[in-house]
């Protein structure tokens, strides 16, 4: 009985939190939150494996003074003792956002896994990140944003994963603690996720090569930021800002055309406006939809109006525009 009471209390706490987060100014805020949830995208998943082993090379001409150089095949990870390869760097070939999974195996027969193994995984977007010490950390933002994870594995063989979502291209693996037995990776994969699939845009044959490259990078960056909302960034500050909604929705309208994601963000921001009907500049999805309280900016509130107008222009969805019209008027 006690167990069921605790579950009921938890459900009520969640319900009260969500209700408290919603605006009391608009009578339809609860409906707006439901409409936002109905537009939540289904992810496109794709599994990736490391392509090559690389090493960091100092290069004054390279971005941030570092570049990567190919040094070997990833097969050694699965056939040789990982203890021989502590500090190895893997290149997955492209920037990815998602989850990392792996499994370990013992090398040899009749060998006991007699002690735990401790591994450190450092995920980096660019070579310079792997070559800049994380500690001591002088930054004002949370140190926990940096993507270094230490995992202790009590037995081998074992399957494991990094518990948080990651954004990276390069992965460095250090062996921090091990016993006398040899072990290697049995499997390793990264499951990338996005609300959209990769596309190729048809540009004019006369398009400058630099513009083509900028367009390619822009498309990829947008894809990585299109998760369950238009994120400010898939690695850090994973939340929805009004200005990011405006900019990313504009780019999406001419590329991926996932207008439901734009609609979701418009409704989510409206549902979580403050009790005076004014929009918060930024909102969060987890653990439940809620705003960054006190984060009000007139410029951002007005940008919301422009974002809704652009959405109407590209979709012709008058129903949504009329539904959110009271929010537009209130910001002015």
What are these regions (language model features)?
Residues 1-23:
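Bacterial Sec-dependent N-terminal signal peptides
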Residues 5-6, 55, 239:
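Sequence-pattern detector for short linear motifs
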Residues 22-232, 260, 281-285, 319:
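Extracellular/oxidizing-compartment recognition motifs
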Residues 144-181, 210, 214, 222-225, ...:
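Aromatic-rich carbohydrate-recognition surfaces in CAZymes
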Residues 235:
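Short, solvent-exposed loop/turn elements at beta->coil junctions and helix N-caps
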């Amino acid at each position: 009985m006690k167990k069921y009471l605790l579950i009921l209390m938890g459900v009520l706490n969640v319900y009260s939190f969500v209700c408290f987060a919603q605006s009391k100014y608009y009578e339809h805020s609860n409906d707006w939150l439901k409409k936002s949830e109905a537009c939540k995208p289904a992810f496109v998943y794709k599994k990736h494996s490391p392509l090559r082993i690389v090493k960091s090379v100092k290069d004054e001409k390279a971005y941030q003074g570092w570049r990567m150089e190919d040094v070997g095949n990833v097969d050694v990870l699965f056939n040789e003792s990982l203890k021989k390869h502590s500090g190895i760097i893997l290149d997955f070939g492209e920037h990815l956002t998602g989850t990392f999974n792996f499994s370990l195996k013992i090398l040899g027969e009749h060998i006991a896994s007699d002690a735990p193994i401790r591994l450190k995984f450092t995920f980096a977007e660019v070579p310079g990140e792997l070559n800049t010490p994380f500690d001591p950390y002088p930054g004002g933002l949370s140190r926990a944003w940096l993507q270094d994870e230490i995992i202790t594995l009590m037995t081998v063989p074992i399957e494991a994963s990094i518990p948080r979502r990651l954004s990276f291209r390069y992965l460095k693996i250090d062996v921090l603690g091990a016993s006398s037995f040899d072990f290697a990776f049995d499997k390793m994969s990264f499951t990338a996720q996005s609300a959209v699939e990769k596309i190729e845009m048809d540009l004019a044959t006369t398009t400058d090569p630099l513009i083509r490259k900028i367009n390619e990078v822009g498309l990829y960056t947008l894809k990585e930021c299109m998760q369950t909302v238009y994120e400010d960034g898939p690695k850090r500050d994973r939340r929805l800002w009004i200005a990011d909604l405006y900019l990313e929705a504009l780019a999406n309208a001419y590329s991926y055309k996932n207008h439901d994601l734009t609609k979701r963000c418009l409704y989510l921001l409206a549902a979580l406006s403050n009790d005076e009907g004014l929009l918060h500049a930024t909102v969060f999805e987890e653990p439940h939809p809620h705003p960054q309280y006190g984060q009000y900016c007139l410029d951002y509130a007005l940008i919301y109006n422009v974002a809704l107008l652009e959405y109407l222009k590209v979709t012709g969805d008058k129903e949504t525009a009329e539904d959110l019209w009271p929010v537009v008027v209130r910001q002015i």
